[in-house]
Swiss-Prot record:
It comes from Streptococcus pyogenes serotype M3 (strain ATCC BAA-595 / MGAS315). HAMAP family: HPr_kinase. Signal peptide: none annotated. Residues 264-269 are annotated as: Important for the catalytic mechanism of dephosphorylation. ATP binds at G153, D154, S155, G156, I157, G158, K159, S160. This is HPr kinase/phosphorylase. The keyword Transport does not apply. InterPro entries: HPr(Ser)_kin/Pase, Hpr_kin/Pase_C, Hpr_kin/Pase_Hpr_N, P-loop_NTPase, Ser_kin/Pase_Hpr-like_N_sf. It holds the Pfam family Hpr_kinase_N. The gene is hprK.
């Protein structure tokens, strides 16, 4: 989905100094943000006009020391048709030459009360997430104790029903059936629902239910980091499953690897409780508490003790 200036204004809560509907619908194609430096001296080699242009205290201070004619000339040269918008931080007084150049070149002029560094961070965070390439995967994404858990498995194995049970147990639904995942950076994976499926769960025999309407706003979440994958598979006698928890299976989405746990599904087995335990155990491991390692250490000590006693 294209990212527009209007979306940036709404998400980062920017004030519109000058813009039209057409200008607000202009697409932003890169998450890079430029803070003009040498450009204000008239040096425009390697200038990237397709980036958002951010003016902070330093840039504003330099502009105010220029004559009105020079200020207009520099800004006129800087504001190109490809430039999606110009943003001024700290509610700084915007020179009339900047407004004039923006109107003449057809560029949205925006303002914010927050500091330049914070504003740059907020805009970069939004643009990085919005412009990242999406990959659609089949499954149910849940927020369990603050951890994003992607539940996958064969069709009809009960992923959505498990998600519903987890919602009833106080956890939050992020996406059902189709999960759009993207890499926020090299080590961080995020997931969100397709817009048409937001807050919806499909339960065989019941149909589509609106989780937010039935269980309230606390039962849903718009997006979540994906930290653990759970794969549900039918229990088969003789098939080997990890019983100690020392398996290191991983799965890769959008270039990011996350751990995956396979859970056998069998009649009478409370899968939602098992998934809760898996999520809590994974978090404990990340905090340095590994029950498997503790057991192995105890076993080693017991074996050593028995050998000595003999």
């Amino acid at each position: 989905m294209p990212v527009t200036v209007k979306m940036l204004v709404q998400k980062v809560k920017l004030d519109v100094v000058y813009a039209t509907d057409n200008l607000l619908s202009k697409e932003i194609t890169t998450s890079d943000i430029s803070r003009p430096g040498l450009e204000m001296t008239g040096y425009f080699d390697y200038y990237a006009p397709e980036r958002l242009q951010l003016f902070g205290m330093k840039e504003w201070s330099y502009l105010t020391q220029m004559t009105s004619h020079n200020r207009y000339s520099v800004l006129k040269e800087m504001f190109k048709k490809d430039t999606p918008a110009v943003v001024v931080s700290r509610n700084l007084a915007i020179p009339k030459e900047m407004v004039q150049a923006a109107k003449e070149e057809g560029i949205s002029l925006l303002s914010s009360r927050v500091s330049t560094s914070r504003l740059a961070g907020e805009m970069s965070y939004f643009l990085d997430a919005s412009l990242a390439e999406r990959t659609s995967v089949h499954g149910v994404l849940m927020d369990i104790y603050g951890m994003g858990v992607l539940i996958q498995g064969d069709s009809g194995i009960g992923k959505s029903e498990t998600g519903l049970e987890l919602v009833k147990r106080g956890h939050r639904l992020v996406a059902d059936d189709r999960v759009d995942v993207y890499a926020k950076d090299e080590e961080t994976l995020w997931g969100e629902p397709a817009e048409i499926l937001r807050h919806l769960l499909e339960i065989r025999g019941v149909g589509i239910i609106d989780v937010m309407s039935l269980y309230g706003a606390s039962a849903v979440k718009d997006s979540s980091q994906v930290q653990l994958a759970i794969y549900l598979e039918n229990f088969e006698a003789g098939k080997v499953f990890d019983r100690l928890g020392n398996g290191n299976e991983e799965i890769t989405f959008s270039g990011v690897r996350i751990p995956r746990i396979r859970i056998p599904v069998k009649t009478g087995r409370n899968v939602s409780v098992v998934i809760e335990a898996a999520a809590m155990n994974h978090r404990a491991k990340e905090m340095g508490f590994d029950a498997t390692k503790t057991f192995e250490d105890r076993l080693t000590q017991l074996i050593t003790k028995n050998e000595v006693s003999q």
